[in-house]
Amino acid sequence: MKDLLKFLKQQSKTEEFNGIKIGLASPDLIRSWSFGEVKKPETINYRTFKPEREGLFCARIFGPVKDYECLCGKYKRLKHRGVICEKCGVEVTQTKVRRERMGHIDLASPVAHIWFLKSLPSRIGLMLDMTLRDIERVLYFESFVVIEPGMTTLERGQMLTEETYLDALEEYGDEFEAKMGAEAVLELLRAINLEEQIEQMREELPSINSETRRKKVTKRLKLMEAFFTSGNKPEWMILKVLPVLPPDLRPLVPLDGGRFATSDLNDLYRRVINRNNRLKRLLDLAAPDIIVRNEKRMLQESVDALLDNGRRGRAITGSNKRPLKSLADMIKGKQGRFRQNLLGKRVDYSGRSVITVGPTLRLHQCGLPKKMALELFKPFIYGKLEGRGLATTIKAAKKMVEREQAEVWDVLDEVIREHPVMLNRAPTLHRLGIQAFEPVLIEGKAIQLHPLVCAAYNADFDGDQMAVHVPLTLEAQLEARALMMSTNNILSPANGEPVITPSQDVVLGLYYTSRERINGRGEGMVFADVSEVEKAYATGVAEIHARVKVRITETSIDADGEKTKATRIVDTTIGRALLSLILPEGLSYDLVNQNMGKKQISKLLNTCYRQLGLKDTVIFADQLMYTGFRFATISGASVGIDDMVIPDEKYTLVADAEAEVLEIQEQFQSGLVTAGERYNKVIDIWASANEKVSKAMMENLSVETVINRDGVEEKQASFNSIYMMADSGARGSAAQIRQLAGMRGLMAKPDGSIIETPITANFREGLNVLQYFISTHGARKGLADTALKTANSGYLTRRLVDVAQDLVVIEDDCGAEHGLTMKPLIEGGDVVEPLRERVLGRVVAIDVIKPGSEEILAPRNTLLDEAWCDILEEHSVDEVIVRSVITCETDFGVCAACYGRDLARGHIINHGEAIGVVAAQSIGEPGTQLTMRTFHIGGAASRASAENNVQVKNAGSLKLHNAKHVSNIDGKLVIVSRSSELAIIDELGREKERYKVPYGTVLEKLEDSEVTAGEIIANWDPHTHPIISEVAGSVKFVDMIDGVTMTRQTDELTGLSSVVVLDVGARTSAGKELRPAIRLVGADGNDLMIPGTDVPAQYFLPGNAIVAKDDNAKINVGDALARIPQESSKTRDITGGLPRVADLFEARKPKEPAILAEISGTISFGKETKGKRRLVITPADGSEHYEEMIPKWRNLNVFEGEKVERGEVIADGPEAAHDILRLRGIHNVANYIVNEVQDVYRLQGVKINDKHIEVIIRQMLRKCLITSAGDTEFLEGEQAEVARVKIANRELIAQGKTPATFERELLGITKASLATESFISAASFQETTRVLTEAAVGGKSDQLRGLKENVIVGRLIPAGTGYAYHKKRNALRATEDAKKAAAKIAPAVTTASEAEQNLADLLNLAGGEE
């Protein structure tokens, strides 16, 4: 009995561990793992199927093939446990030891481990400071390497070819030692004294000047230090003993017909053993050197293939010509150990079936077929049957269930009651793809799904399948109910809006109910209350659309939950009054007293959730759905061909457009317009014709004229089915109706360009063959795109999840004093996103001051909810500094205050919430809705870009932002600064619009003056860039020599002459060094100064500048001295959609990025080279100036002598995120990425909260470059984790030492994932080999902080409910550590009683650990 107990205990023994360390295995360690040496390549005996002795499957080394039975059969059964059979030498034990016992092979000659050799950068190469080619030549026996130079002129590590070796031998004899093969490399590695080398390199580092050499030394130093601190020895990178995988992990399975299926590893091992044995034999026979050498090389190659096939040379192939799967292939890739088995497991207690509609279900229910339920809940049913005494044994219970006896169904009903099940639909793109429901048993074989959750699952009923999972334990059921129940997931985690909104039929039904019809039966009746209305409708006295008066009683609930009732008479319709029956008390009747479209219903649900909470909303949503279905049925809205009414004006509009096109065609033929202009104009004509037709059609469809009861004509919204469907948002859109009843319009080619002949027909008239062909042309690309899009979007989501997976909320408040500045987002003058949308649910970082006073409106650390946002709007606050995860100071994780509101729950976020994964899902999930294409700007778009004025849309007053200006002779302002902005402020001080205005803009209004809507307030010439005079005086030409640096041109039409400066390249050699300029002099002939400075007013002229003034001409302030023609900017393709989002998150550099000023100072141009200009920026304080070479073809925005600020744009182009971070700081780069990503999603109408993008940006910014190391362990120029550096700095500051300084670095998401602290997480993401090699060499240990690592080692994740478990474990660990520390310094035991007590403690401790 005691044995049995001991045996059972031994089974459940699990090691408690807090981290996983990876390192190099020494030969002794490998031998200690091994249970014996594998000496023969044989596997099993083909006749007896018994494993061969000392072979790859040997039972003596690896354990018995059958449980508790030795190979020869002498000992069987449990009583002989642990006996080793004297005949066959097999230990009698469980057969599962064959999964864990390893063997080994003693190699006759050392072999280099290919990962440390070939995985770049080559660790062996770095260690020995030799090139990879040289090492390979040594290893594969092509040349010798000197190991011990002795007293000769040779050096250690020098390469010798066969000839030079022989020459050296003749010259020096055996003074020196040179070898080839892995032995040589082994000896070189052994000879390295790490400590000495490290000291030496640390000393020489500061004195190294060349950048490349410094980098190389730093790399080598880091590698050596990694080896030194981790206790790995360099020579362990060369294998002397090869471990053999346990046989059950590389199985050999007999198939019928006497053939075998085997794992590729067996072939690879056999190869190694064969060659190793042959090499041993050759060495015993003392064979000639060349043969031994060849055999050693082959051994090296076979070990390479076993470890990583195909890494070097050609992959070894099996009998069927496919490369064999090596050990490395086993762990990497989608089918490897990490992604196939550790991160994605299959689960039991699950089933799947097709889904159908369950319109009668409540929101928290799902219909489960009886057959499935019976199968899934079997264990519970057995338990209940036995507990009830209906079955005596489990076997009897099984029989009952198989026969499906009547009692079984009763028991099933009970078991299933309040036992939630989880439904999942693949692809699970966000957390709403798995939700819990209470099952309701149904007949049939399809799962019934509640229609309102379809949106979250993205499910429809055209054959979709779903999987059911049963949570077994009580805890799992609790979590499913409390966290995953569909009723708890009403708001979307991506944007905080209801995800449970009615769509399609339900919307149509509610819309139909709430419409009004003039002259409806029962119009003008007056009702005392809603129940009378119900009576009137039921008896048919009044129809549903009739306009009536009803007395309504409303309940309003104030903040304290006090209810007050109020009664009023409302003009409404029968249908709306009926809707008020299901309206929960506390909501205003006005919410349903309108046409209920999809938007209105969504708003209604949102209001309900915010005012009344979860429970009421859920009940209300269900009621809305039932009502909607009911009235959709009653309405009988359907689509017939007569509903598509074609407007009569269509034909005249099309004829007009055709006439215009003909006219342009004639102009083109007579040479008045170019081909490009003709194309653009034709497309514009057709586009506007299409607009007109669709407008006429919608007017025709949407309104009908009827005679009301006073006999007067009145217009009312039409009851046309197609119009109702589109107007309510149930199905279709104006664009689709246009194709049905208007004209199809212009079509695109697969490359995105527009075909200039439109399709004038619509679907009701039908298309002819040519029109049909044109339609298919662009449509096919759409289908191909969709397939690619899904894959790309999935990959983006995977990268996002991987970079953000370990970000969890771990504390309440980190105390960060700063945050991001939030302003309303304004583009091209329109407010795209008001301030309230951007700050709702976030925490204030710096007190919000009431505008125009000193009073604090919202104190720091206020969570801005809807009420606060209303207050901010009342006081017209136009910027708020809010806390953000980007500026959060928490070390490993973030704090709740910096994150703000949990969007899916509506209150501040809880501890342990996995915000990283939620953010990744929220960004990735709509990825499939984004487009895949690059937009080519054609037609209207490219011409709009050359705008030349600002026309305001709102009345208000004018404000200028960072603008310098001068007044010209007419008293108008002329802008003389770059990147100036002009804003319109309303009377409350709120910013309504904002525009960028270029240098040289003339303003029609002064600052702070009033403007009216539609007024043009600024003008500029888009095609030339002026040089504006800032003083009045006379023009003096400098270095302007006719025919050398300039030419005179006379305009043929006007006869005016102007001076054109020659480009440097076009000048003669005499003019190359001259710098043409215009100087301004006063009446006395002295230089004038620029106002406020002592800099003379002298303007250098670049090449091609056109000077309109002559020498000595008079000039006024604000006049243009010269104009530089701008080549119209090349139409750049705009990358849109998914590729753009991926580029932003990968932080890729654009092709021709904008050039930004690296420092603030004055611009000048240095000596030019062949294709480049030298730009010099000299700072005002006289410190070091900055030089940059810029290609000539780049269009510069700056001139000689101009002042620029750091980070200002010098040459236009797309800005690179890295530059923005370096020159303008974290806040700007965050703003840039957030806005750019949001632009893409906004185009598709997808709403995502900014927080999610910020979370990803935080992860992209978590590394930094050390600029000076201070007293820390870091090296200068090393990349380190920001949190690590901050922790180290805090400790140093506490000790009064110098902290390290660092520069934040922006990494793309792939790079950032691979650079995480956790090697397990990185290895399971991408580039497994590289990650593991690096980790092993550094002896890294993984602290299992993130989610992925914990899933892989089979623990609860440190998020959600697992967060508490991990917290508890950490607390226990801390107390254990404290105990250990205390035990070390405990005094010696003095009395017997104390000794006894200690012993008792120890025993208790030991007992507690079991």
Curated annotation (Swiss-Prot):
Pfam family, one: RNA_pol_Rpb1_2
Binding site for Zn(2+) 2: C814, C888, C895, C898
CC cofactor note: Binds 1 Mg(2+) ion per subunit. Binds 2 Zn(2+) ions per subunit.
InterPro entries reported in the protein's UniProt record: DNA-dir_RpoC_beta_prime, DNA-dir_RpoC_beta_prime_bact, RNA_pol_asu, RNA_pol_N, RNA_pol_Rpb1_1, RNA_pol_Rpb1_3, RNA_pol_Rpb1_3_sf, RNA_pol_Rpb1_4
Biological processes annotated in GO: DNA-templated transcription
EC assignment: 2.7.7.6
Residues involved in Mg(2+) binding: D460, D462, D464
Record's keyword annotation contains Membrane: no
Superkingdom field: Bacteria
Cofactors named for this entry: Mg(2+); Zn(2+)
SUPFAM superfamilies named among the record's database cross-references: beta and beta-prime subunits of DNA dependent RNA-polymerase (SSF64484)
UniProt keyword terms in alphabetical order: DNA-directed RNA polymerase, Magnesium, Metal-binding, Nucleotidyltransferase, Transcription, Transferase, Zinc
Any Gene Ontology CC annotation: DNA-directed RNA polymerase complex
Catalytic activity: RNA(n) + a ribonucleoside 5'-triphosphate = RNA(n+1) + diphosphate
CDD domains: RNAP_beta'_C, RNAP_beta'_N
Quaternary structure and interacting proteins, as annotated: The RNAP catalytic core consists of 2 alpha, 1 beta, 1 beta' and 1 omega subunit. When a sigma factor is associated with the core the holoenzyme is formed, which can initiate transcription.
Function noted in UniProt: DNA-dependent RNA polymerase catalyzes the transcription of DNA into RNA using the four ribonucleoside triphosphates as substrates.
Family of the protein in this entry: Belongs to the RNA polymerase beta' chain family.
Protein's name in the database: DNA-directed RNA polymerase subunit beta'
Gene: rpoC
